[in-house]
Amino acid sequence: MDDLSKLLFFLLLTISITTALPDKPGSGQINSNSVLVALLDSHYTELAELVEKALLLQTLEEAVGQHNITIFAPRNDALEKNLDPEFKSFLLQPKNLKSLQSLLMFHILPKRITSPQFSSAVVSHRTLSNDHLHFTNGKVNSAEITKPDDLTRPDGIIHGIERLLIPRSVQEDFNRRRSLRSIAAVLPEGAPEVDPRTHRLKKKPAPIPAGAPPVLPVYDAMSPGPSLAPAPAPGPGGPRHHFNGEAQVKDFIHTLLHYGGYNEMADILVNLTSLATEMGRLVSEGYVLTVLAPNDEAMAKLTTDQLSEPGAPEQIMYYHIIPEYQTEESMYNSVRRFGKIRYDSLRFPHKVEAQEADGSVKFGHGDGSAYLFDPDIYTDGRISVQGIDGVLFPEEKTPVEKKTGVPVVKKAPKPRRGKLMEVACTMLGSQFPTCQ
């Protein structure tokens, strides 16, 4: 009996030890002496910020747990000043998250390479993005290595380079952003969804086999998607509220905060006004909305007089909400085709005028105009958010003053007899009745 109890105790101990061991021995938490910690605390602040925005920390932790890595870090001014503004804006758009990740992984090798290994012969090494970097004469892809062995750690090394390395796939994605080949017969997709609890990308569901019952309910399939844009707002729905407008409004406000640069807009929608609740109610009723969101720099230019009047924040925001579903492509195609477009706004009866200017969409008139420069921040088929660089105000019509002059009094002319009748009456006297 004692042998049996010892055997059972040994089995239970073995099972508990097995379950306590991690599945991947190299996927534990990194220590303070890791090359990733050195990168985040280094003077390469622009690169570290891009790594955090691209949600690559978890991926790099797993890579460091398996092998050493080599990071080629561009200088801060190469990312801040010497980079094309349009290309940088393209990388920071949520829908281009994959391109940003590929660009950053192109700077990382899954092995340790020190400066003595930079030979004069041409050598190629595979990166974490499955592309190749070519080394020759102290250069990597024709970019000079300015600070070799700048930061050295047990699990990796960081070399400083003079400029950003751009893989061909990312360059092609950037060049196709306005070509017909990238937008013809292609269903627009929303930005990648990020789980707010873990700050990681939500995984796409597995493909549904043929004949399987639908995963989404019918009312989700009924909602008009981006392929129908531009489309007028549908009529109000019934009392069942098939569309969860409050959840969609929360998603787009969370996207504004995560995108960065639109905190003032989100603060007005949630805290200063009740517009977020009103928008959620409209979407629940079946309406679609397009929000022209001014960035923080534009909101900072508002004066105290413009915001101090009762209801001023609501009226300003109402003018930036269009009761239609419009994407950047649909707006740009409309103004290219028709010249000027006047969109209805929730600030009735004022309309928002749009026209094509400098390869983009321009809203408003004169000094109060604004350009669309952050396209498709959030597009889910019912709410579309487009970033603009100014706050719009409706055009004030100046009343035409009527000229007031001295009224001219017209006197009625007295009836006058003809000259011939006067002469005849004078000669013959006033005997005839006509001379009376």
UniProtKB/Swiss-Prot annotation:
Residues making up the signal peptide according to the UniProt record: 1-20
Major place of residence: secreted
A GO cellular-component term linked to this record: extracellular region
Cross-referenced InterPro entries: FAS1_dom_sf, FAS1_domain, FLA15/16/17/18
SUPFAM superfamilies registered for this protein in UniProt: FAS1 domain
Keyword Glycoprotein listed: yes
Intracellular or extracellular location(s): Secreted
Top-rank taxon: Eukaryota
Keywords: Glycoprotein, Proteoglycan, Repeat, Secreted, Signal
Residues bearing attached sugar chains per UniProt: N68, N271
Positions of the FAS1 domain: 31-165, 249-392
Role this protein plays: May be a cell surface adhesion protein.
Annotated family: Belongs to the fasciclin-like AGP family.
Name the UniProt record assigns to this protein: Fasciclin-like arabinogalactan protein 15
Organism expressing this protein natively: Arabidopsis thaliana
Lineage, top ranks: Eukaryota, Viridiplantae, Streptophyta, Embryophyta, Tracheophyta
Gene name linked to the record: FLA15
